Amino acid sequence: MLKTTIIGASGYTGAELAFMVNKHPQLTLSGLYVSANSVDAGKTIAQLHGKLANVVDMVVNALTDPKQVAQDSDVVFLATAHEVSHDLAPIFLEAGCQVFDLSGAFRVKSDGFYDTFYGFEHQFNNWLDKAAYGLAEWNQEEIKNAPLVAVAGCYPTASQLAIKPLLVDGLLDTQQWPVINATSGVSGAGRKASMTNSFCEVSLQPYGVFNHRHQPEIAQHLGCDVIFTPHLGNFKRGILATVTMKLAQGVTEQQVAQAFEQAYQGKPAVRLKGDGIPRIQDVENTPFCDIGWKVQGEHIIVISAIDNLLKGASSQAMQCLNIHYGYPELTALL
């Protein structure tokens, strides 16, 4: 049994991870932690997340000595803020822990990226170079071998899963950049209260127009520029991404279908709907990404739907763990 620790356990993604670790036949939950000054320290996770009552009743402790925690852990999930993951990951890695980081701290290898989009200067280029990008369906060999897996972001997961099969097979005219319009539920903003995610203030609206940090993450890992506009929706969880692209000359609907089928054959977390239209309610509280598409002339619209807290975060992190250790991909996820 792998001793598994969750840092940032009080948040939505941390709670989802606690449920999965408890359910996993090869993992044992060795500790739940929050920052030293968190008001949640000392409470049980079931007090913070009622759905875990009589499931996981472990106390959430303040993280005061990460080196000691590392000695008691085989696996560490970091469900923490970007700058916190940046500082903590090397401590656990140097102690020999396998680390799965749900933040953006190790996702993008690009000069100046973290200064520009995350507001801090990256100090650990050696670990940045060693990190595998945790887009589970596309980077399995890297995930199997890396000591650090930087789990893909929520919007980047929904977007890339919709685009990559066509891009890899050379079916797109990339002179016209893919245009991604994606809407996320309010849980994507986290558990901490703010005016932005207040019940009475939430209204469907775009944000981060032309400057959202997920645009360069998507573009770098696709190897293709994109126009990405995120939207905040007035619902709790889920992401729906609608991607408009131009097909290369002469590409047929049959080639499109074949590209998706070949890309995701044997990939149990992706469900292809063909010309059916994905819906958030079909993926909510599941580890799946549903993908559908429509072709008209030289253009294609691909729609993908995920649960932002699961396939966009916690279940993808667990899927990466399963890939890394050779367990069935959906172990503890269904």
From Swiss-Prot:
Transmembrane segments: none annotated. Coiled coil: none annotated. Pathway: Amino-acid biosynthesis; L-arginine biosynthesis; N(2)-acetyl-L-ornithine from L-glutamate: step 3/4. One of its GO terms (molecular function) is NADP+ binding. One of its GO terms (biological process) is L-arginine biosynthetic process. Its main location: cytoplasm. GO terms for cellular component: cytoplasm. Gene3D superfamilies: Dihydrodipicolinate Reductase, domain 2, NAD(P)-binding Rossmann-like Domain. The keyword NADP applies. The active site is at C154. It catalyses: N-acetyl-L-glutamate 5-semialdehyde + phosphate + NADP(+) = N-acetyl-L-glutamyl 5-phosphate + NADPH + H(+). Pfam families: Semialdhyde_dh, Semialdhyde_dhC_1. InterPro entries: AGPR_AS (IPR023013), AGPR_type-1 (IPR000706), NAD(P)-bd_dom_sf (IPR036291), NAGSA_dehydrogenase (IPR050085), Semialdehyde_DH_NAD-bd (IPR000534). It is found in: Cytoplasm. Keywords: Amino-acid biosynthesis, Arginine biosynthesis, Cytoplasm, NADP, Oxidoreductase. Its EC number is 1.2.1.38. Catalyzes the NADPH-dependent reduction of N-acetyl-5-glutamyl phosphate to yield N-acetyl-L-glutamate 5-semialdehyde. Belongs to the NAGSA dehydrogenase family. Type 1 subfamily. This is N-acetyl-gamma-glutamyl-phosphate reductase. It comes from Vibrio parahaemolyticus serotype O3:K6 (strain RIMD 2210633). The lineage of its organism: Bacteria, Pseudomonadati, Pseudomonadota, Gammaproteobacteria, Vibrionales. The gene is argC.
